[in-house]
From Swiss-Prot:
UniProt organism field: Listeria monocytogenes serovar 1/2a (strain ATCC BAA-679 / EGD-e)
Top-rank lineage group of the source organism: Bacteria
Family under the similarity heading: Belongs to the internalin family.
Protein name per Swiss-Prot or TrEMBL: Internalin I
InterPro entries, A to Z: Cu-Rt/internalin_Ig-like, Ig-like_fold, Ig_E-set, Inl_IR, InlI_Ig-like, Leu-rich_rpt, Leu-rich_rpt_4, Leu-rich_rpt_typical-subtyp
Length: 1778
């Protein structure tokens, strides 16, 4: 450990300018320990971390985001700071006694110890006296009355007198007497109650003094004479305001005064320099306002002023020229830094949490500044940041007002730039940041990152949570490893290509539709794209290092091929629109695959997935699992909720290790083809199986072999027989709810079943679960429904036997009986059951011993048949009615369908008026039905009315109804009275026609048919109208028609009412002239002549607008312009007016974006008058907290099963925002198996993070003999025995009488007994059953035996390095001391500190003692301590280091690059690098590394070769790929010099085309350029045969093949025609036509032959030769074919004529040179025809002849043979379509 720490310290010293200061964290609330311990530890850790990240690690390190690394570093730092709070700092003192008494003389004391002194007499403070007595005598039981002399006191050099809390009875308050300890060098008085330090003034040998946490210490008088003091700790002294006494201490190096009450720092020394050696000053958590005194400290390097809330500026520090570190964090009133230009040595400044700091413009011209941390401030202005050549870390996080970062340029050493959580909208240029490695810009308002370019070392980029709509090209970021652009507004990230180091991409939570091809990402390991609008991820292929893909919650329909993803482990594409996963195969590392919630219908074979363990395909449309291939390691398969689509399983024989299978909510066995689920029978490793809600499953016999099943859910199916489950002996939980099960005897022997749910079945005998209940299992069998066979009701009553059986075999009495039934002696009786056919029911319900059994039994019944008919029937005298007609008339029927009969014929006389009672009966199978009675009434006939049809009267005549009847001669044939509606129907005061109805009825109430008479009342003459001819009104005046008529004096001659169309003809809201027509109709409806009146309406005046000046809306409010105008009470002061209010509300205001908008309201009337506009400020607020409503309480039966969703439904929980889900603690806080009241809290949080007010709901769980406790009366235990309450209850045999597992016996055992103190204790036992009934308490006596003496054991010897810091506790650990560990109270002591001199080599004997609290003393043991001599330090380094010429470096960088290390802390490595190495000159230099420790021992020198060379440019790889990214030609390489440009054209590749030129610049990073080719679809070659007139002489033929293939066609023999020719070429992308022209047959000509050869420059054959034949003297033309990798030398074609002598044409080729910068193109012709319709015509006799001439006979023979050969060759062509 020591060696490791030494290496870390040396690394910090050497790599100071490289270590990331942002990880140097200082504890926020430390009060009692020196802060440098924590900071130095953090520095060491940071340096170590820096070394690891610079030198690299394994492949996995790259994929861990740097944030995670920093978080881990921060965690480690925090842990070490916490440790520092609990441990003493390095300066704390250990008691050390010098035993060489020969060196101590009484005369050396300034004040002699009085003779006969005791500790109590010499030291007035009893606690001090006792502590010193214990320390000096070595006797832990010392009382202070022991004698003391000067020698004993002078022997002490280090003394630890730290207290407990500063307020403990054992703490020291008076240090009088310490002046006698004149040889003290280290003294710790922390955590006491000291106020007077005067006794310390003579302790001039003190080097280290700790006075922290003395709450009554108000000043430091007494320390001013401690001239050798180097370390002083006065922290956490809340009353300490003045520390001026330290000013004169000449060698003081470190002061810790944090957490005091210092407001003014006065440091003056009239006698000399103020604190001339002080290097570190801790002043955190005080109230300083001025730092002037600190500026005068000549060697001050480290200043900690964190938490000085009143400090407003740092300018008073400007004179502290040696200051290297300032921690001014949490100085909440700090508004400005002021002028600190004089701090030329400053390396680090910490300003975190300075909430009023708005600018850091002073941070410039500081040549040594390495780290600036100013997060969580109020910074708006960065200034220029000029001349900061060593700045490596700049942290400006959470400065919300920081919008401009243009100052962040020209920082050549900057490595880390953290700007998250600011208000940045534009990045700026980021010029000259060549070493920037980390850039954090998350949570800003950035809209573009196009400026992020040319950052050659950038490896980490986070721009998440911004307003980006594009990511641009991200050029020149060759080392980018980590990229996060999530939570923006991106729609296209197609530029994410060619990042060779990128291993992490996060584009989630955007609106991305296009991802692009994502090529050249060889290092990519993680890709996150969830929550976008992506439809295509086919680009995910050929990524050899890809491990994780999350593209969930998108719109994906195309997932591509997933080729070449050998390391892919996790693939999540859930919640998309994928229809097929057939490409999920050949992924050798895939472990998890989630494709739930898609539209998948095809899952493919899913083979060659050897590591796949988890698959989720739920919520899809999969019809069958049959296609699933061999998945040898699959453990979990979830294919739930495919609903009606999933109907078949297939064989399922390819998943032998499957443990969990979820198939709920499907349609398995819909077609009956799944039979008995036998396809699952081979899955013998299954432990969990869910087949819930597959409503067509009725046979489960195939599950009988699944003997390892632990959990099985078969809810909601059609299962009746469960006998197959009797073999599943490992089942622990079984759910069979909602099936058709009646018999559960098959479950009786399942001994491991502890939870059974069989609710909603047809079970009425629960006795098979007796064994389960008796062993404590939970059985739920509620809501059973069972229907008994139908019984008959005789005289409306019936009785049945109770069929319901409880688990113990007894009858379970009904809990309620319907229709007032009665239960007695196991029988149920119903009476008064009057319905003819119905059912009744009874319920049963019992909850006991963990069994819930309830349900409803239905008893159908039917009674004897009943006759029904209408109650009465009426006939008229004389009617002829048969019995059959009568029964039909009264709707007679019998309930059982039997014929109905009556006594109608014998009882009723239809010729005699009166009422008759008829009886109706029925009979069936000899059983008489219930009869009924019908009353038959025989009545007289109806009268007939006669009268005149019309009559007329004069207007206003007086006519009575009697007169009217006489006038119309009204009468009836039966002389019955006639009535009319004359008086109500006729108005004799108004002319017109009226209809009067005449009615009459006989004495039986039989009514006559109504007769109607028309009465005419004569009318008056038409009225005459008079009025003014015109009138004028103001616009918008309010005039009624009546007022208008009054204004024009309208009247008539007979007083008839004048009416007009004024209301419709005149628009008083619109200026103009209107014509109004007056009319009048008299009371008889006679109309007068209409009269026209002109109405003039004048124009309106311009109005003004009034409105509210501000309006607020909730986010997403649905507000249109009309609603807005209403909400702001916008109105026009003139009313009415035609001016219409308008606004730009709908174009200006974005209701989905909170903010403030200005809306302009205008108005213009119809006459062109424009009102003055008004502006309204519209504020769109964040979404308000949702409101939850629910019932205040709810009650559930004990042991009920209720999910959280069901609970929320039961309490009618609703929320005002339908998009927000309600959550609760129901499932965690409510125990439905235990009666009582539970408080459940409902919560909800909306999308803006606003939380609803929690709503509390009381859940009552309903609740039987008081338990009795029995137990042993006494028991004893050894002291420190580890006895739990459960063990105690077991040991005393505590039991309760009811035996219920829910009745738990409790006790106060833990609180009533103390195993650390031997004595007897009384423990009380209590018990409360599950219903809250308490048992009588029982008392038990517990005796704790005394503790024996500890047996000490340790190593016989131990070795330490010279000067190694070792405390007594360290010594105990190192010798592995045993015997005093917990729980023993024995405390080990030793003379280690007094005996062992760690500064001196030698062997020392140390004695270890121990005594426990019960006074038992251990046998002492001795240990030999060896102090070893130091050795020379050892340097290690790399043998050589390479630099580019002119590269910026120095000695520190050299030490870092050579990995130079030394095995001793505080020893510096020195080099002659600066003298030996000329970085501007190429060569090899030898640098020597040396080091010497403080003892003068020199390390062996180490030589390192430094090689300076010219910078070399990396190669450029050239790839040629098709549309799928597959290589179609061998890759090539370009080389060149650094910064030179290169350009390369796409080469010709047969079958493909690409017209592109790619260019770039050679750099220090290897590059790859890719040509993307498109496949050429071959055209057809058509062969035509025509005569000289173009007429076809034979059928066309076609030749097909691939583009670039050679083809050859020969003229075939056509009877009567002659043509001898061969055509050849290459198949091209375009169609071609070859026409052979035939002439009329003539005598055969001789033929000639040409051989075409293809050779390289050495004559080596490159391709098969080709034969060309033709008629002698015919011309020929041949071309060189294209040969890949070669170019033609010379002419690429040859021409001539056929001769009798065979001829040879040879084409020579040379091999193409490698593509280079100077010659990127491949020469050579492709020989592909340029025309799309190539016609080759061979014209006999027309071509010039060349060559030799032979005799005619030989030519004929040769020609005939060639014709045969050619014919055979032609018809053997494999690709010629005949």
């Amino acid at each position: 450990m020591k060696k490791k720490f030494s290496i870390v310290i040396i690394s910090v010293l050497l790599l100071g300018y490289l270590a990331p200061f942002d990880t140097l964290l200082v504890g926020a609330d430390e009060t009692t320990v020196s802060e440098d311990t924590a900071v130095k530890t953090a520095e060491a850790d940071s340096a170590t971390e820096g070394i690891e990240s610079e030198t690299g690690s394994d492949d996995e390190t790259a994929e861990e985001p740097k944030e995670a690394k920093e978080a881990e570093a921060s965690k480690e730092t925090t842990e070490k700071e916490e440790k520092a709070k609990t441990e003493e700092p390095a300066s704390n003192i250990k008691t050390e006694i010098n035993t060489d008494k020969s060196q101590l003389k009484q005369t050396s004391l300034k004040a002699a110890v009085p003779a006969g002194s005791t500790y109590n007499s010499l030291f007035p403070d009893d606690n001090l006296a006792k502590k010193l007595a214990v320390i000096i005598t070595g006797n832990a039981a010392a009382t202070g009355n022991e004698s003391v002399d000067s020698a004993a006191l002078l022997a002490i050099s280090q003394l630890d007198l730290s207290g407990e809390t500063g307020n403990d009875p054992t703490d020291i308050s008076n240090i009088e007497g310490l002046q006698y300890l004149e040889n003290l060098t280290s003294l710790n008085l922390s955590e006491n109650n000291i106020s007077d330090l005067a006794p310390l003034k003579d302790l001039v040998n003190l080097v280290s003094l700790n006075l922290s946490s003395n709450r009554t210490l108000v000043n430091l008088s007494g320390v001013e004479d401690l001239v050798n003091l180097q370390e002083l700790n006065v922290s956490a002294n809340k009353a300490l305001e003045d520390i001026s006494q330290v000013a004169s201490l000449p060698v003081l190096k470190e002061i810790s005064a944090q957490g005091c009450n210092i407001k003014t720092l006065e440091l003056k020394n009239p006698a000399g320099a103020v604190l001339p050696e002080l290097e570190t000053f801790y002043l955190q958590e005080n109230d300083l306002t001025n730092l002037t005194s600190l500026a005068k400290l000549p060697k001050l390097k480290n200043l900690y002023i964190k938490g000085n809330a009143s400090l407003k500026s740092l300018e008073t520090l400007n004179g502290a020229t040696k200051l290297q570190l300032i921690d001014a964090s949490n100085c909440t009133d700090l508004e400005t830094l002021g002028d600190i230009s004089g701090l030329s040595e400053l390396e680090m400044i910490q300003l975190s949490g300075c909430s009023k700091l708005k600018e850091i413009t002073s941070l410039k011209n500081l040549p040594n500044l390495v780290n600036i941390t100013a997060d969580s401030c109020a910074i708006e202005d960065l200034g220029t940041l000029n001349n900061l050549p060593k700045l490596q870390t700049l942290v400006l996080s959470d400065n919300e007002n920081l919008t401009n970062i243009t100052a962040i340029t020209d920082l050549p050493q900057l490595k880390t730039l953290t700007l998250d959580g600011c208000g940045i909208t534009s990045i700026g240029t980021l010029d000259n940041l060549p070493k920037l490695e980390k850039l954090d810009l998350k949570e800003n308002q950035i809209t573009s990152i196009s400026e992020i370019t040319d950052l050659p070392r950038l490896s980490y980029l986070d721009v998440s949570v911004n307003n980006l709509t594009t990511i641009g090209d991200l050029k020149k970021l060759p080392l980018l490893e980590w990229l996060n652009v999530s939570s923006n507004r991106l729609s296209d990230v197609s530029t994410l290509t060619n990042f060779p180091s990128l291993n992490y991409i996060n584009i989630s939570n955007n609106v991305i539709r296009t991802v692009g091809k994502m090529t050249e990402l060889p290092s990519l390991k993680e890709f996150y794209a969830q929550n976008n609008s992506i439809s295509d991820i086919s680009m995910i292929h050929d990524m050899p290092n890809l491990r994780k893909v999350d593209a969930s919650n998108n719109l994906i329909t195309n997932i591509g091929t997933f080729d070449n993803l050998p390391k892919l482990q996790s693939l999540d594409v859930h919640s998309n629109r994928i229809t097929s996963t057939s490409v999920i195969h050949d992924l050798p590392s895939l472990e998890t695959f989630n494709a739930q919630t898609n539209l998948i219908t095809n899952i493919g074979t899913m083979d060659n997935l050897p590591d796949l363990t988890y698959v989720n395909l739920s919520f899809n449309r999969i019809p069958s699992l049959a296609p699933i291939g061999d998945l040898p390691n699959l453990e979990t398969l979830i294919v739930s909720d495919n609903n009606s689509y999933l109907r078949s399983l297939g064989t399922m024989d390819g998943v032998p290790k499957l443990r969990i299978l979820d198939l709920q909510n499907n349609y398995l066995n819909y077609t009956g083809t799944e039979g008995n689920l036998s396809s699952l029978s081979d899955l013998t490793n299954l432990t969990e199986l869910n087949l819930r809600n597959n409503v067509y499953i009725d046979d489960i016999s195939g599950l009988s072999t699944l003997s390892r099943l632990i959990y099985l859910n078969l809810d909601s199916n059609k299962i009746e027989d469960i006998s197959a489950l009797s073999n599943l002996t490992n089942l622990q939980e079984l759910t069979l709810e909602n099936n058709k099960i009646e018999n559960i005897s098959a479950l009786s022997d399942l001994e491991n079943l502890n939870k059974l749910v069989v609710s909603k079945n047809k079970i009425i005998d629960i006795s098979p679960v007796a064994n389960m209940v008796n062993r404590g299992a939970i059985v739920t069998a509620s809501n059973q429904t069972y229907t008994l066979p139908t019984v008959l009701s005789y005289q409306s009553s019936f009785t049945i036997d109770n069929p319901v059986i409880w688990y113990d075999g007894t009858l379970l009495a009904p809990s309620s009986i319907g229709n007032s039934g009665n239960y007695k002696d196991g029988k149920i009786t119903w009476t008064n059951m009057t319905a003819t056919s119905s059912s009744t029911l009874f319920n049963f319900n019992r909850l006991k011993d963990g069994l819930t059994f309830s349900g409803t039994v239905t008893q159908p019944y039917k009674s004897a048949a009943k006759v029904t008919a209408d109650a009465e029937q009426t006939y008229t005298i004389g009617d002829t009615i048969s019995e059959e007609q009568f029964l039909k008339d009264v709707n007679a029927k019998s309930s059982d369908g039997a014929p109905v009969t009556s006594d109608f014929a014998t009882v009723v006389d239809l010729n005699t008026f009166g009422e008759y009672e008829v009886t109706l009966t029925s009979e069936k199978d000899g059983i008489q039905g219930d009869s009924c009675k019908v009353i038959v009434k025989v009545l007289h006939g109806a009268p007939v009315i006669s009268a005149d049809q019309t009559i007329s009267y004069d207007k206003h005549a007086t006519i009575t109804e009697k007169q009217f009847l006489e006038d119309i001669h009204a009468s009836t044939d039966l002389d019955t009275a006639i009535t009319t509606n004359f008086s109500t129907a006729v108005n004799l005061n108004k002319g017109g026609d009226y209809t009067v109805a005449l009615n009459s009825e006989n004495e039986d109430g039989v009514k006559a048919e109504t007769v109607y008479v028309t009465v005419t009342v004569n009318k008056d003459p038409a009225p005459i109208i008079s009025a003014k001819t015109e009138i004028t009104y103001d616009k918008f005046s309010k005039k009624t028609e009546a007022a208008f008529l009054d204004d024009i004096d309208a009247d008539t001659n007979d007083g008839s009412i004048v009416t007009s169309n004024f209301a419709t003809a005149v628009n008083l809201d619109k200026a103009g002239d209107y014509t109004v027509t007056l009319n009048s109709i008299n009371s008889d409806g006679v109309a007068g002549t209409p009269t026209a009146i002109i109405v003039h309406v004048e124009k309106e005046k311009i109005a003004t607008i009034s409105t509210n000046t501000a309006q607020q809306y909730e986010k997403y409010a649905k507000i249109n312009e009309t609603q807005f105008l209403k909400d702001v009470h916008a109105s026009i002061n003139a009313s009415p007016t035609t001016a219409v209010l308008e606004s730009d509300f709908e174009t200006v205001v974005k209701l989905d974006v909170p903010g403030t908008y200005t809306v302009t309201i205008t108005a213009t009337n119809e006459d062109g008058g424009v009102s003055a506009p008004k502006e309204v400020s519209v504020i769109v607020r964040k979404i308000p907290a949702p409101e939850i409503t629910a019932d205040k309480e709810i009650t559930y039966p004990k042991f009920d099963e209720v999910s959280e969703a069901e609970f929320l439904n039961d309490i009618h929980a609703t929320i005002s925002d339908k998009n927000v889900a309600i959550t609760s603690n129901f499932s965690t806080d409510v125990n439905l198996n235990k009666a009582g009241d539970y408080t459940v809290t409902l919560n909800a949080t909306n999308e803006d993070g606003v939380k609803a007010t929690p709503v509390e709901v009381i859940v009552h769980v309903q609740q039987g003999e008081r338990p009795v406790i029995t137990a042993d009366a006494t028991i004893s235990y050894d002291k420190f025995a580890n006895i739990t309450e459960a063990k105690f209850l077991e040991d005393i045999h505590a039991t309760s009488s009811d035996g219920q597992s829910s009745t738990v016996i409790t006790s106060n055992f833990q609180t009533a007994t103390n195993f650390k103190t031997a004595m007897s204790y009384t423990v009380t036992l209590n018990a409360v059953n599950e219903d809250g009934i308490s048992a009588e308490p029982v008392a038990v006596t517990v005796t704790i035996n005394k503790e024996p003496a500890a047996a000490l054991k340790a190593d016989a010897e131990v070795s330490y390095a010279k000067n190694e810091a070792v405390t007594e506790s360290d010594f105990f650990k190192d010798v592995h001391l045993e015997g005093t560990e917990a729980p023993s109270t024995a405390k080990a002591t030793s003379n280690f500190d007094s005996v062992v001199d760690r500064s001196k080599t030698g062997d020392y004997t140390v004695t270890i003692n121990a005594t426990n609290e019960d006074g038992a003393v251990s046998t002492p043991i001795e240990v030999i301590v060896h102090i070893e001599a130091e050795s020379a330090p050892v340097i290690t380094a790399n043998a050589e280091v390479k630099y580019n010429k002119h590269e910026q470096t120095d000695e520190r960088r050299f030490l870092y690059d050579s990995e130079a290390k030394i095995d001793e802390a505080n020893v510096e490595i020195k080099t002659d690098f600066a003298e030996k190495v000329d970085i501007n000159k190429v060569g090899t230099y030898t640098v020597t590394l040396t080091a010497t420790n403080e003892d003068g021992q020199a390390a062996n020198p180490v030589e390192v070769s430094v090689i300076v060379s010219d910078a070399a440019a990396e190669k450029v790889n050239v790839k040629y790929v098709d549309e799928n990214g597959s290589e179609i030609s061998a890759a090539e390489t370009l080389t060149g010099n650094l910064d030179e440009t290169f350009s390369i054209d796409a080469k010709s590749i047969a079958g493909y085309k690409c017209d592109a030129t790619l260019s770039g610049v050679f750099s220090t990073v290897e590059q790859t350029v890719v040509f993307h080719y498109k496949a050429i679809k071959p055209g057809v070659v058509t062969i035509k045969y025509e005569d000289t007139n173009g007429k076809a002489v034979d059928e066309d033929k076609q030749i097909t093949g691939e583009v670039g293939d050679d083809f050859e066609a020969e003229a075939q023999t056509v009877s009567g025609y002659s043509c001898r020719a061969i055509a050849s070429g290459k198949i091209t992308e375009e169609p071609q036509t070859i026409t052979f022209t035939y002439s009329t047959a003539t005598p055969s000509k001789k033929s000639g032959e040409i051989t075409v050869q293809y050779v390289d420059e050495s004559g080596k054959k490159l391709a098969d030769s080709k034969k060309v034949t033709g008629n002698i003297d015919d011309s020929y033309s041949v071309e060189a074919k294209a040969i890949e990798g070669y170019s033609v030398v010379g002419d690429d074609s040859a021409k001539g004529v056929f001769t009798e002598k065979s001829q040879t044409v040879t084409f020579k080729y040379k091999k193409n040179t490698q593509v280079s910068k100077d010659d990127p193109k491949v020469k050579g012709k492709t020989n592909q025809p340029s025309s799309t319709d190539t016609k080759l015509k061979v014209d006999n006799n027309s071509l010039p002849a060349t060559g030799d001439t032979e005799n005619m006979i030989l030519a004929v023979l040769i020609g005939f043979n060639m014709l045969i050969v050619a014919s055979i060759f032609l018809f053997r062509k494999p690709k010629t379509n005949q």
